[in-house]
Amino acid sequence: MSLHPEIAAVTDRIIERSKPGRAAYRALMTQQREGGVGRPRLGCANLAHAYAGTDEQRDAMKDGRRMNIGIVTAYNDMLSAHAPYYRYPEQMKVWALEAGATAQVAGGVPAMCDGVTQGYAGMELSLFSRDTIALSTAIALSHNVFEGAALLGICDKIVPGLLMGALRFGHLPMVLIPGGPMRTGIANSAKARVRELYAEGKASRDELLDSEIAAYHGKGTCTFYGTANSNQMMVEAMGLHMPGAAFINPGTKLRQELTKAAVQRLPEIGWNGDDYRPIGEIVDERAIVNAAAVLLATGGSTNHLIHLPAIARSAGIIIDWEDFDRLSRAVPLLARVYPNGSADVNGFEDAGGPTFVIRELLRGGLMHGDTLTISGDSLAAYGQHPALEDEKLVWCDHAEASGDDTILRTIDAPFSEEGGFRILSGNLGRACIKVSAVERDRWTIEAPCRVFSDQHAVHDAFTAGELDRDIVVVVRFQGPRANGMPELHKLTPPLGVLQNKGFRVALLTDGRMSGASGKVPAAIHLSPEAIGGGPIGKLRDGDIVRLCAEEGILQALVDPVEWDARELAPAPPPELGTGRELFAMMHQADEAEKGASAMLAAAGL
C-alpha cells in the first residue's frame, strides 16, 4: 500500500530539518569506513594485548581475515531482565566460530533498575545513566579491533544508551540481542490494586511485598508494557533485532535459536562482503519514524519522547514532539497491553505481538516498508513471526485476524483511530501526555492546584488527607537540569486512589512518569523546566489549572497582568549523597524535547 500522506509529510519534515546534521554524520561514518579495518593497522604489541585474554580463538584472530565481533553487554543479576545474559558471551563465541568469525566481550555497561530505585535517591541518576552507557559503549568499541558488534541490553536507559554510543561507530554492522520477558506471574491489575490498598493503609507491608514478588518472580523483563518492553518494540521497527525476537521467553529453544541467528548474521553483513549493512545506514529518518509509529500504535512509554530524540541526534537526525503529535493523529491504537489494558506482554505476544503490529501498519501505509534492516532490504520480514520447524528457525505468516482482539487488533478495527500521545501547550509551557490508558472523560481536567517541589511531600499530603478533592498536583524542580528528571511513578497509587474516590485528578510536572504509569492524566516533561525559569515556577497553591488533551491546552487560569508580574519560586538546594554529586553534568543538559542529554549538548550534536 502507498505511504500515508501524513507519514510522508512528517518524514519529509524530519529529513529537511536534519540535512546539515545527517550530512555531517554520514561524512564522518564514511571517513571511518574508508580508513579501513582497524586490526591490520594496529601494532603487533597492540594486537597481542587484544588477543591475550582469548584461548581457542587466538589463532583465528591472529589470521586477521575473520570478522571479530565486539560484544557490549549490560549483564548484571540485580536486574532480572539482564540476568539471562550471564551465559550469552560463551555461547556467542561458539556460534561466531561456526560462522567463520570470532567474538570477544568488548566491554560492559551499567544497567540500573528503575524498579529498584523508584522513589529513592538513586532514581536521580537514572536518566543520566543513559549518557554513561553511551560513553561506556564508545569506550568498549574504541579499541578498534572489531568489525561488527552485538549489543546485549533491554531495559529503560540501556537500549537508548547502547544505541547512542553505537551510532557513533555507525560504519560497523551491529545487532541488538534481547533476552525476553519473564513468564506471567500475578496479573498486573492485581498488583496495582494491592499497591492502592497499601497507599490507603488497607494492606500490610508483608502483603505488598508478597504481591510484588509474585509479579516480579524470575529472570526476564518485567511483563508490563513499560519502557523496557517499548524499547524492544522500537528496535524491532528499526530493523535491528532478528525479526520477532522481542518477546520470546528466556530459556527456550526458540530464544536460543534467535540469538544464534543474530550472531551468525553479523559476518554476512560485514564490510568485506557484498551485503554490507552498517548501523548508521539502517538508522535513518525513515527508521526513526517507524520507531515512533509502533510506539504510538501500541501505547508505548512516554520516556521515548525523550529517548528517541536522543537516539536520533546521535545519528544526525532531529525529531521533535510536534512530529510525535502529528504521527499520533495518523497512527491508530492497535494494542492494549498493561497499563493500557489488562494483558501483559506474554499475552500480547500470544495474540500476535510486535510482528502482527508491524504487518498491520505496513498494510495501512503507516510505516516505511523500504528501510534497510539487518534482515533484508525491507521491513516485510518483521511482519512474520519466528517459530521452530524440525528444530530449525523459520519465519511464518500471521493469520489474518489477531489471536485475541481484546489485546491486539487490525487496522480495520482499531481500539482508537489515533495513537496514544498528545502535546499540550499554553502559558505554562509545553508538555506531553499519554492518553492511551486514560478514560476519555478525563482528557480534560480543570481544578485548583497544589504545588510541591518534592514527591515525598505529595505522599505526606495524601496521607494527611489534604488532597481529597478535585486537584491538579504540581511537582516542579524535577527536570533534567534540576535533579536528573527522576520518574515519579510512586505517585501513581495515591493519585489513583483519589481518582477512584471520584475526584478529578491530574499531575503536572517537569519530571517524568514511568512507562508503567497509566490511568491518571499526567502532563509531563514540561519545558522549560522550573530551574530554567519555566513558568511552572509561577504557580501558587489554589491557582486553577486547565489540562485538555482534546484541544492540546495547558493553561494557568490566572489574570494575565498578575501572571506576568509574578516572581518565580526559588529552587530548593540540591540533594547530595548516593553519588549524585558526581553527576553534576546534568545541570548542563538539554531540554526534554531535545533528549535531555548533557553529553549530546556538550558534543554539539
Residue ranges of predicted features:
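Catalytic or ion-coupling anion/metal-binding cores of large enzyme and transporter domains
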Residues: 1-77, 81, 90-107, 120-122, ...
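Glycine-/small-residue-enriched capping loops at alpha/beta junctions
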Residues: 84
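N-terminal small/polar loop signature for handling phosphorylated ligands or for N-terminal nucleophile
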Residues: 106-144
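Contiguous domain-boundary segments centered on the initiation and propagation of an alpha-helix
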Residues: 130-137, 144-149, 459-467
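A short, small-residue-rich loop immediately preceding and capping a beta-strand
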Residues: 137, 141-162, 175-178
